[in-house]
Amino acid sequence: WLGSALKIGAKLLPSVVGLFKKKKQ
C-alpha cells in the first residue's frame, strides 16, 4: 500500500504546491 500512497502523494503534491503559490501572490 505504501507504493500506491506514494503515487497518490506525487500526484497531489504539484496541485497543493500550485495552490500554495497562488495564495502567496
Swiss-Prot record:
Predominantly, its location class is secreted
Q: Which UniProt keywords apply?
A: Antibiotic, Antimicrobial, Cytolysis, Fungicide, Hemolysis, Membrane, Secreted, Target cell membrane, Target membrane, Toxin
Q: Which GO terms describe its molecular function?
A: toxin activity
Tissue specificity, please?
Answer: Expressed by the venom gland.
Spell out the GO cellular component terms annotated for this protein, sorted alphabetically and separated by semicolons.
extracellular region; membrane; other organism cell membrane
Write out the annotated subcellular location: Secreted; Target cell membrane
Q: Name one GO biological process term.
A: defense response to bacterium
Q: Which family does it belong to?
A: Belongs to the non-disulfide-bridged peptide (NDBP) superfamily. Medium-length antimicrobial peptide (group 3) family. Ponericin-W subfamily.
- Function recorded in the entry: Has a broad spectrum of activity against both Gram-positive and Gram-negative bacteria and S.cerevisiae. Has insecticidal and hemolytic activities. May act by disrupting the integrity of the bacterial cell membrane.
Q: What is this protein called?
A: M-poneritoxin-Ng1a
